[in-house]
């Protein structure tokens, strides 16, 4: 009997739109990395830091189409990823500035996001960041990102019982299970799109 073919390892670039150290959205992404290590073979979540990116300014681009070193390094990580998991906080009903800045830098010149799958998780007040998710999906249309539709995860972070500890780490087991379902959907969708290539 032949051994089953090994599943390819799918590299998930996890990008948090909040730069705050104890960000709840960062906590969701850390939990996602832990869930993958514990229970989802073939899926690896790598955090991609966007805090060092300069604000988008095309004057920083070189005459031959080059970018500042921090931007080049970020674009390389985006290109190397098989798919993306965005932790998208909601600021004033929309996407946080650091995340929009990262999206814009990696779309300059050759669009590094194009034709790759993605998922969004968010945490916050009100709708749990849900409105930022819809704006991110709208931006993704132009970037040719392919978002999973379901399941959605928007955590109402300030409702009781507490969902996060004082360091922003997820402590809610039910939300952790919901993150797992998002990741399984992203994994299946990524494999499906890769088979079409």
Swiss-Prot record:
NADP in keyword set: yes
Pfam family of the protein (one): FMN_red
Cited InterPro entries: Flavoprotein-like_sf, FMN_Rdtase-like_dom, NAD(P)H-dep_reductase
E.C. code: 1.6.5.2
Any one GO molecular function term: FMN binding
EC class of the enzyme, as a word: oxidoreductase
Any one of the GO CC terms: cytosol
Catalytic activities: a quinone + NADH + H(+) = a quinol + NAD(+); a quinone + NADPH + H(+) = a quinol + NADP(+)
Cofactor(s), names only, from the UniProt record: FMN
Alphabetical UniProt keywords: Flavoprotein, FMN, NAD, NADP, Oxidoreductase
PANTHER family on file: CHROMATE REDUCTASE, NAD(P)H-DEPENDENT FMN REDUCTASE LOT6
Protein role: The enzyme apparently serves as a quinone reductase in connection with conjugation reactions of hydroquinones involved in detoxification pathways.
Subunit and partners: Homotetramer.
The family this protein is said to belong to: Belongs to the SsuE family.
Protein name, as recorded: Probable NADPH:quinone oxidoreductase 1
Organism: Oryza sativa subsp. japonica
């Amino acid at each position: 009997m032949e051994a089953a073919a090994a599943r390819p390892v799918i590299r998930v670039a996890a990008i948090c739109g909040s730069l705050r150290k104890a960000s709840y959205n960062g906590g969701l992404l850390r939990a996602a990395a832990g869930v993958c290590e514990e229970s989802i073979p073939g899926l690896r979540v790598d955090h991609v830091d966007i805090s060092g990116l300069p604000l988008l300014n095309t004057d920083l681009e070189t005459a031959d189409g080059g970018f500042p070193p921090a931007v080049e390094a970020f674009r390389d990580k985006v290109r190397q990823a098989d798919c993306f998991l965005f932790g998208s906080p909601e600021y004033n009903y929309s996407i946080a500035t650091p995340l929009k800045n990262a999206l814009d830098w990696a779309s300059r010149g050759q669009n590094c996001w194009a034709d790759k799958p993605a998922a969004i998780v968010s945490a916050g007040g009100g709708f749990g960041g849900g409105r930022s998710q819809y704006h991110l999906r709208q931006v993704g249309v132009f970037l040719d990102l392919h978002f999973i539709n379901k399941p959605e995860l928007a955590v109402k972070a300030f409702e009781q019982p507490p969902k996060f500890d004082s360091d922003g780490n997820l402590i809610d087991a039910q939300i952790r299970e919901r993150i797992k379902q998002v990741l399984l959907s992203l994994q299946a969708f990524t494999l499906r799109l890769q088979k079409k290539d």
